[in-house]
Amino acid sequence: MSDTLVRIKRAILSGHYAFSEKASLELESDGLTELDIVESIVNAVAIYKTIRSQSPYRKQVREYLHIIQSTNLEGLMVYSKGKLVQEAGIETYYFLISSKKAV
């Protein structure tokens, strides 16, 4: 398991995560809960893909988005995309940009 995935899981398990408005809308439209996303990330054995952010709103020159596809505890495949963020001395938190059922 990668160091990045371990850091993401620790942030999630510590409650250090947030959802963008887009991710919240996707959750609602797919009938998912925040717990479904948390379970999916905790169950993940690998990061599916890491990409560089193309957003003009990014705060750093290099910002990476981590895509995780894994099942929740009921076996439902969930797709999430997010980034690790360092703020105010808190180790990290994971900001979810996209969260929905995997196709």
Provide a role label for each language-model segment.
Residues 1-103:
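Ribonuclease/tRNase effector modules and their secretory precursors
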